[in-house]
Design a protein with these regions (language model features):
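Extended alpha-helical interaction scaffolds
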Residues: 1-431
């Protein structure tokens, strides 16, 4: 950045001056007599003057079509009526902004604790606060875009990449530090609460549903609070999906597994808190099957009794009655009386029952859920959700893990951040 913004030694300035000189080859300015004759012809001819006179482009040259965007940036193509994307874009303004960034980074480097000051600088961007570096990045991207598609590669190399490289120098250690903070404050507690518990694992131990809500609830959940507090500047929501900010996240490499995980939990939150309170509403319809004369399904105190009558929808809510948690299914065949298919105790009993069946999607909101009884009879229900996959979304948590890295960073940056965090912890202990 020092070399690029040096008015005497800058290779960028030298290159742009050369391009401007070459681009103006063969240009001819319109003389005073030509201008008077043209105005007279317009008056005599009575032609309406266009809103944008495409012929009034200042000096004309054979290379204008190719070098026009660069000449406009350098102020070498300034006809009075020429159409310009933005008169405020100029190479001099860009270099002034680069100098401001360089001075800011030099200030960080000469601080008593450069690592801490650099993390503070990066954190302002993570939290959505504007700084000189990101403003200049955006200005460079705007200049690159204003040059047009033919010059896009040149514009990116000259005006975007130098600042991106400088930004990466700031971001890498800070991203590693944020990874460590995410791992300690969120992931560690998540694993303590849910590892080895149903529905995350095939286990007899149940995960706490209120604790799951504590993590995934929209806006007030632990995950949303962390993301909106620490990453508001580089990550935002579009609908229910978390999406990286295309401008401020330049130089950052988000861990794809992290984005998939938080978006899966965000969708689950929408399903689990559709009406604001914790719970999932859905409908069930029993289906007639051969050799079965009656089924009785109980879900948290809510009963669906079917004895081969005309099938009808019945509404359910899970969790239902908290004093009667669990699911129980009995069936009666033509050859025997009522028998117990399964009794699933606890809050997650209904989800455990669903986990035992086979699921076939019929359309966007309906699934056929089938169970094979010990006598090889098939017991079937159609499940209709109100949003997304309904209660079946909870089965997708099997094998789910919350990644401990938000960003993909190199090992050196990770080691540097961990060492800095260790020093901070040691100082806190001394105090």
């Amino acid at each position: 950045l020092t070399l690029m913004s040096d008015i005497r030694q800058s290779p960028l300035i030298a290159l742009m001056n050369t391009l401007a000189w070459q681009g103006q080859t063969g240009q001819q300015s319109e003389g005073l007599s030509d201008s008077i004759i043209k105005s007279a012809k317009d008056l005599v001819g009575g032609k309406d003057k266009p809103a944008i006179d495409q012929s009034a482009t200042g000096p004309q040259g054979p290379l204008d079509e190719t070098f026009g965007p660069l000449l406009q940036l350098l102020g070498k193509n300034t006809g009075s009526n020429v159409m310009s994307a933005d008169n405020s874009l100029s190479l001099q303004t860009y270099l002034t902004r680069v100098t401001r960034v360089r001075l800011r980074l030099q200030q960080v480097a000469s601080a008593s604790d450069p690592q801490e000051m650099m993390q503070t600088l990066a954190q302002t961007v993570f939290q959505g606060k504007s700084v000189d570096l990101t403003d200049t990045q955006q200005y460079g991207s705007l200049i690159s875009a204003s040059l047009g598609e033919e010059w896009s590669g040149f514009g990116s190399t000259m005006f975007v990449q130098p600042l991106t490289q400088a930004w990466e120098t700031v971001l890498q250690p800070s991203a590693a530090s944020l990874n460590d903070k995410w791992s300690r404050s969120v992931v560690a507690n998540w694993r303590t609460a849910f590892d080895g518990r149903f529905p995350f694992a095939a286990s007899k131990s149940d995960a706490s549903l209120p604790m799951l809500a504590e993590f995934i609830r929209k806006d007030s959940g632990r995950i949303d609070r962390f993301l909106t507090t620490e990453l508001n500047g580089v990550l935002h929501k579009e609908g229910s999906q978390w999406v990286p900010d295309k401008v401020n996240s330049q130089g950052l490499s988000f861990n794809p597994a992290f984005l998939r995980a938080i978006n899966q939990l965000s969708e689950l939150s929408d399903i689990l808190f559709t009406d604001g309170s914790q719970g999932i509403s859905f409908d069930l319809q029993a289906r007639p099957v051969p050799r079965v004369v009656e089924t009785q399904l109980t879900i948290d105190g809510q009963k669906l009794h079917y004895f081969n009558q005309m099938a009808d929808w019945q509404s359910f809510r899970w969790p239902g009655d908290t004093y009667k948690p669990g699911a129980m299914l009995t069936w009666t065949s033509v050859n025997a009386g009522a028998r117990l298919f399964g009794d699933y105790r606890g809050t997650w009993g209904f989800i455990r029952w669903l986990d035992q069946g086979k699921r076939q999607q019929l359309d966007r909101s309906q699934w056929m859920v089938s169970f094979t009884a010990p006598d090889d009879s098939t017991l079937q229900w159609v499940l209709r959700s109100q949003l997304g996959n309904g209660p079946l979304a909870l089965l997708a948590l099997r094998g789910f893990t919350l990644p401990d890295q938000i960003f993909s960073v190199d090992s050196a940056a990770t080691a540097q951040a961990l060492m800095a965090n260790t020093e901070i912890s040691d100082m806190d202990g001394i105090e």
